């Protein structure tokens, strides 16, 4: 039977990872290693300055752990290299995140980081996120569409094989709409995320300042010379966005011009 490792950044008890397990439990043997507490926006952080403690969850056949103060990357690393080192995983899936992970948000995302860690460890990986609000703001949050999409995607992978080669992963974003409103799937590039750079200053009872970094509204613009629907464009039109991500961040188109610039600097 196929084996799938699940993680997230919303924490072991989050609704999204429960919905993900429920969607896949009849398709594969499911293992879950997730942070004990929410670790949103922790990016690719791994814990190397303090010890990690893994708590085995009772009644889960030894396949569920939560990691005290662990990040999604910690969870995947520990699962593959220690907790379940005897298991050969067919997939790592991170999610279902409560909120989108599109554009440059993928760099901040702990959800995407969980899938990146799976990719680094040599396992085909998927990050999946559920949009919390879009133009249909009165639509109640439901994982029905996300569950259907991940089932279809996993079945396709089990049948045809993983579609990407090398250190690449799939990033999936689910629109906040019903199954009836859903218009299909789009293969998309990342959009250009627009940030507001908000910081909220507060004062505690001792008259000391503290700060909350602002949550940014979902705003974006098209990238230059890009005609495809972006991930943002897809979800606001009730399409599922599927984006291939590459771990290699090298800007190959700039190598030659950078060489010329560097030679000029040395003269």
Swiss-Prot record:
Organism: Helicobacter acinonychis (strain Sheeba)
Domain of life, source organism: Bacteria
Positions of disulphide bridges: none
Cofactor(s) required, per the database record: a divalent metal cation
Major subcellular site: cytoplasm
Residues the record lists as binding a divalent metal cation: 9-10, 40, 97
Cofactor mode of binding and number, as noted: Binds 1 divalent metal cation per subunit.
Designated name of the protein: 5'-nucleotidase SurE
GO cellular component: cytoplasm
Task of the protein: Nucleotidase that shows phosphatase activity on nucleoside 5'-monophosphates.
UniProt key word Cytoplasm: yes
Reactions catalysed according to its record: a ribonucleoside 5'-phosphate + H2O = a ribonucleoside + phosphate
Transmembrane helix recorded as keyword: no
InterPro entries: SurE, SurE-like_Pase/nucleotidase, SurE-like_sf
GO molecular function: 3'-nucleotidase activity; 5'-nucleotidase activity; exopolyphosphatase activity; metal ion binding; nucleotide binding
Family membership: Belongs to the SurE nucleotidase family.
UniProt-annotated location(s): Cytoplasm
Keywords assigned by UniProt, alphabetized: Cytoplasm, Hydrolase, Metal-binding, Nucleotide-binding
EC number: 3.1.3.5
């Amino acid at each position: 039977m196929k084996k799938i490792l699940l993680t997230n950044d919303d924490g072991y008890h989050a609704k999204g990872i429960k919905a993900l397990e429920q969607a896949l439990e009849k398709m594969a043997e499911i293992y879950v290693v997730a942070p004990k507490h929410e670790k949103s926006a922790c990016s690719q952080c791994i814990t190397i300055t303090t010890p990690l403690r893994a708590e085995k969850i009772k009644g889960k056949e030894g396949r569920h752990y939560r990691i005290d103060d662990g990040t999604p990357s910690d969870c995947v690393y520990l699962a593959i290299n220690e907790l379940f080192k005897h298991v050969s995983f067919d997939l790592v899936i991170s999610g279902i995140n409560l909120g989108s992970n599109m554009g440059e948000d993928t760099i901040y995302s702990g959800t995407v980081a969980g899938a990146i860690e799976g990719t680094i460890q040599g396992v085909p990986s998927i990050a999946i996120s559920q949009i919390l609000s879009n133009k249909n703001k009165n639509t109640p949050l439901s994982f029905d569409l996300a569950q259907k999409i991940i089932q279809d995607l996993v079945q396709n992978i089990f049948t045809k094989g993983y579609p990407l080669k090398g250190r690449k992963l799939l990033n999936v974003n689910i629109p906040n709409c019903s199954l009836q409103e859903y218009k299909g799937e789009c293969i998309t590039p990342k959009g250009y995320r627009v940030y507001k750079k908000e910081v909220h200053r507060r004062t505690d009872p001792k008259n000391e300042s503290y700060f909350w970094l602002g949550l940014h509204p979902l705003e974006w613009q098209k990238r230059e010379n890009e005609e495809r629907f972006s991930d943002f464009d897809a979800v606001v039109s009730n399409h599922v966005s599927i984006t291939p991500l590459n771990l290699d961040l090298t800007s190959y188109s700039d190598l030659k011009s950078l060489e010329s610039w560097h030679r000029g600097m040395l003269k």
